[in-house]
Each structure stands twice: as structure tokens, then as C-alpha cells.
């Protein structure tokens, strides 16, 4: 390649070998790199860069002082590109034995393509203020306070009583690193003698968002009667949306489900019928009503069916089950092989995440029963495109739940031991209570306790190393405490919840989320 470059003139093309198998990622580092070993820790090391690259929604963070916990990073945006990483070597050969002006040096260039760059990270934002744990003395001398502020090991009581200069970092750094134009409006000027009207609901705008036109009927446990038919607005909305044979078929399938079983959760419906989520929001209020409180809360019930008057509805009651984790149970939240539905660490804050553009769903797609995936030839079959797995509503022994908080119906607990607990009072159901329904008191607590033990055994079989160190400390204690999920808990259970159950673990109140879809 070097010889060819020497023979060709200026501006001539040179053939090079393209190594397509070498895909690379480029980081436009905002500085002069003299030592790669010191540069990598500022980006989180190879492991940190790999973790950010694996998630296309994350931004690459650069810490100027990696060991300083008060260092605020600058963030790089991720872009797709089609670039080449080219290595060029200039070689100069001087003629031996020739001195003076008659000496000519032979210059050659070696060019080599090291790989193809498909992803590039660019630092385009502004850097925020940096706060240093430094104290300025009277004479202008700066003294570091890191050894007095940071706890690198367990300290004695004297460490907390030492005299220190006041050092208060900001409670929050800037959430945005890009300049934004703010258009200030002049203050409204009124004529002389104008008085502001009294504050009331009549002259205030935007007290709440507009009600969504899904027209669902909500029923509380203490309500005397249940609706026998949907609202006329719900029927009209579904007739307006139901414009193709696919929608009519889905309606027939949903009616058959409610004929077989009068009470369903939305996840259970999604696991049995393939229907677009937006269509299901409109269809469910046309077929069933929604129970807010009681043992059938967060469930959809067929119009005209009152579970409070039918003991057979016991098997359709809901069980709010949450996986409890903590060191006393033998595994930490990070060790649990069950993901959280959402986490405070994954929220899309502008400082850490560059949100990807969402795919739009057109009215044509909804009318045809399609989603935002393009043409029907490149999609999954319509019979299974929107279907969920059975594990979202069925509990089986030996299988872990997909999330740390689950809402099961009692009939979907496919374990013989659990069904025995449920059917202990068959034929002797005297009354239906808001807490236990048609079951015996504390039935839900016993079910959670048994399910927790099953999950502990499953985790032990999948990851035995987690329990090797905790077995001695536990002293053979196998029982895993449970969380009732009810309002009527004693003080001891509340203390355990505060200790073990963290909101950041991602448990999500599905009932509130579902209600918000219709309010």
C-alpha cells in the first residue's frame, strides 16, 4: 500500500482493505489524552463504558475527578455514524553517504483502516459548576477537607464531634446541560381600580386534566348495587372505534372469556387475547365494570355479576403479593433474579438519559388493529402480537414471578398446597368481608407466607451461592416474612415494611395506574 501511494500523484485514489468485521465506538473526549490508563476511569472504566453502550437510551458521563463524590459529570450524547478509523504512518528514508543540498529523503505513507465506527459519543453540553471540599483560611491558603468529610471506614464517635469549617454542597445540580431560550412575558397591567376576582373553581382554569373518554364504571365494595349494563357513552365509543372485522372478533373473544369466568384482571385478559392496548382500554368498559376496593379490587367484573352475593366468587379474589428481599432473607435486592417494574434509578432525567423518539401510532393503524411496527408482513402474527406470557397472572411452583409485585387471582395459583388453603371453608362461607372476602380470616397472609417460602427455595436452587454465607448467620431459619398489602396491619408489620420494602425496588400499584387510564 505504501509503494502504491508513492507511485501515484497528489490527489489520486489509493485502494485500501476494509475490515468490516471490526466495529468500533468513538468517544470525542473533551481533553488531551496523554495517559489512557488515567483517562478510562473518568468514563467509568471499560465496564462502565460497556454498560452505557449496551443501553442506547443512556448518556456517557465524564467525571473530571473520578474519586471525588462531589464531582458533577458532563454528559455525552449518542449518535449513529458511518465513519472509518484510519491509521496513517509517515516514513522518511534519507540517502546514506549524500550530504548537503543534494540529499533527498524518500517519504512514504502507510495507511490502514482499523475498523468501522457505527456509534459516536459527543460532549455537546455545558459543564456545570464544580464544588471542591476545600477550606480557604484567613491567609488565603487552601486546605483540603476530604479526609475529614468522607468516611472511608467505620469511624468512632469522636469523628462526628470534630470541629469542621462549614461545607454545604448544593442540594441538586443543574438538570439541563443545554441552553434553553426562555421567553419572558410582561406582567399584566390592569386599569386603576381593578380588583382580582375571588379564588373559586368557577374562575380557575385547568384544575385538572380533561377526563379521558373511556367511560369506565368504578364500584366500591360498600356500594349496594352493581351496574347491569355499560354507559351509553362507552357503547358509542366502542362502536366508533370498532371499524374492522379484527375488532369485532376481539369483542367476541372477550365476551367468551367473561362467560367462562366472570372476573378477570387486565393482565390475564392480555395473556388470553391479542388486542392493541389502546383498543382494550375502550373495550373493557363496554364489557365489564371495575372494582376499586375489597377482595376483588383492581379486577374487571362482568356486568350484572355481584361477587359479594355469590360464594363461588371466592376463587376470583385478588392477592397482592410482593417478594420481600433483604440480608436477613439471604439475598439483597441486587441479587434477586427478578426485575422491578420500574426503578428510581432508571427514570429518564435529562441530565443522564437521552430519550429516544417514540414510534407514533396512526389512526389508520388503530382502525386496522395494528400497532406502530409498520407493515403486517414484518410483524408477528395478529394472534400473538400483543399477547403477554402466562406468568404475568399465573403462579407456578418452581418458577419466579416476572416482577417483584404481582396481583394474582386465587384461581390462578396453580399449586395444590395453595388451593388447599383457599378451599378450607368450602360450603361454610357465612359472610363476605372487605378484607378476606369469602375466605377464612388471614387466608391471604398464609398464602403469601407459603408462596414466599416457595420462591426462596426456587432462588436457592438457581443461585445456591447466595445462601452459603447466610445459612450460618440465620441458624437454619427458613421462614420468609411476607407483606400483606392491606391497610389493617399491626405495628410490627409496618416496621418490617419500612426496613425491607423500598419504593425504589420498583413495586408499582397497578390499580392506581389502571384507574388513571380512565380518569
Swiss-Prot record:
Any one Pfam family here would be Tau95
Q: Which GO terms describe its cellular component?
A: nucleoplasm; transcription factor TFIIIC complex
Concerning PANTHER family, the annotation shows: GENERAL TRANSCRIPTION FACTOR 3C POLYPEPTIDE 5, GENERAL TRANSCRIPTION FACTOR IIIC, POLYPEPTIDE 5
Q: Does the keyword Acetylation apply?
A: yes
Q: Which GO terms describe its molecular function?
A: DNA binding; RNA polymerase III general transcription initiation factor activity
What family is this protein classified in?
Belongs to the TFIIIC subunit 5 family.
Its assembly, as annotated, is: Part of the TFIIIC subcomplex TFIIIC2, consisting of six subunits, GTF3C1, GTF3C2, GTF3C3, GTF3C4, GTF3C5 and GTF3C6. Interacts with BRF1, GTF3C6 and TBP.
Q: What is the lineage of its organism?
A: Eukaryota, Metazoa, Chordata, Craniata, Vertebrata
Q: Kindly list the positions at which N-acetylalanine occurs in this protein.
A: 2
Keyword Acetylation listed: yes
The disulfide bridges present are: none
Composition skew (Acidic residues), residue ranges:
484-500, 507-519
Name of the protein in its database record:
General transcription factor 3C polypeptide 5
